[in-house]
C-alpha cells in the first residue's frame, strides 16, 4: 500500500498539471492558434482560397522522387496518421455532447484558417531542412528555429519536449486506447492486448523512419477512406435525417432554435467546443506535421506546404465531418447534448453506427479505433525520431528511443497513467507555443517561397531546371543556409 504522503504528493502533481493543461488548451493556446490562422491567411493573401486547385492536386505524383528517402506522399501520410486518430471519433463526439451540432460549423471555419498555418509550417520545414549523410532529409520546428532564427538552444528545447511527448508518452496513450477498444468489443484482457500492441509496434518502430513511412503510406489513407465510405453509405440511405443534421449544424451554430435566454450560452458552447476540436484535431500550428514535412524530397518547398494543407482538409472537413453527421443522423436516442460527457463520448460514435446499421458493426468500429491508434503511434514516433536526429546522430540514441517507445506502449496497454498523459498535454502545448512564435517571426520566408512558386508556376520542364527551387531565390529575404538546396550562383 502506498504511503499517504506519496498519494497526497501525486495528487498535488495531478492537480497542478491539470490546471496548467486546462489553462493552455482552454484559452491561451486556442487563441494563439486562431490568431496564427488569421495571420497567415492575411500574410499569404488567402493561399488556401487562391490556390485551392494546387492544394487539391498536391497528392498527384507525390509518391515519386524520394531517391531512397521519404516521398512527399509518405510525409503526408505520416501527418495524416496523427491527424486522423481516435480524436476524430471520440473528440468530435465530445464536441457534439458539450456544444451540440452547431459546434461543427465552427470546426469547419477553424479548419479553413488552419490550412494557411499548416501550409506555412510545412513550407518552413522544407526551406530549412538539412541533408543527412545517407542522402535523406530532416526538418521541422527544431531546424527552422535553429537555422532560421539562429536559436539552436531553443530548437533543442523544442526537440526535447516533442521527443518525450511523442516518443514515450504518446505510445502509452494510444496503446491504452487499443486495449480498451478490444476489451470493450470482445472482452480481450489487457495483458493479451499488451502482447498484441508490442508485437505490432516493435517491428515498425525498430525499422526506423522509412519503415514507419511505408506503413503509414498505406494504412492511414486506407482507414480514412474506409470510414468515409461507411458514413457516406449511411447518409445516402438516410437522406432525410442527413438533411436535418446539416440544418441542425447551421441553426445550432447561431442559436436559431433557442430562446433569447439560452441564445448566448448555446452559441458560446457551440463556438468554444467546435473551435477546440477543429484546432487540436488538424494539428495545424502544433509543430508535429512539420517534422514529417521536412523529411520529404520535393523540388519546391511549397509543394509540401500544399499537401500538408490538404491533410487539414481531409482530417477536419472530411473525417471529422463524417463523425459529426453520423451521430445526429442516429437521432436523439443516441445524441443527448450536455449529458454525461466523459462517459458517453467514448462510445457515442460506435453507438450511432450500431443504431443505424446493426450491432454487428461494433467489431469493425473497434478495429477502426485500433488501427487509428496504431497509426497515431507510428506518426507520433516519427516526429520524435526527427527531433532526436536534431539532438544527436548517434545510433545508440535512436535504438534507445525505439526500445523505450515499445516498452512504454506495453506499459500503457495495461495501466492508465493519468499524470503522464496530462504531462504530455502540457509538453505538447508548450512546444506548440514555441512553434507558433517561430512561425510568425519567419513568416517572410513563407511569403518569399510562395512568391517564388507563383513566379515559376507553369514553366515548362523543357526549359531546364527553371521550375526547380533555388536556395538563393530572389524572392527570399536572404540566401538559405547551405545543406539542402542548390544555388543559382553555384555555392
Tell me what each language-model feature is.
Residues 1-86, 96-103, 410, 440-441, ...:
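N-terminal alpha-helical transmembrane segments of multi-pass membrane transport
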Residues 13, 44-48, 87-92, 101, ...:
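Transmembrane helix-loop junctions in multi-pass membrane proteins
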Residues 41, 120-129, 232-248, 260-262, ...:
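Extracellular/periplasmic helix-exit of transmembrane alpha-helices
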Residues 66-98, 124-127, 133-142, 146, ...:
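Alpha-helical membrane segments and immediately flanking helix-loop junctions
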Residues 46-72, 94, 100-104, 116-149, ...:
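Flexible loop linkers connecting adjacent transmembrane helices
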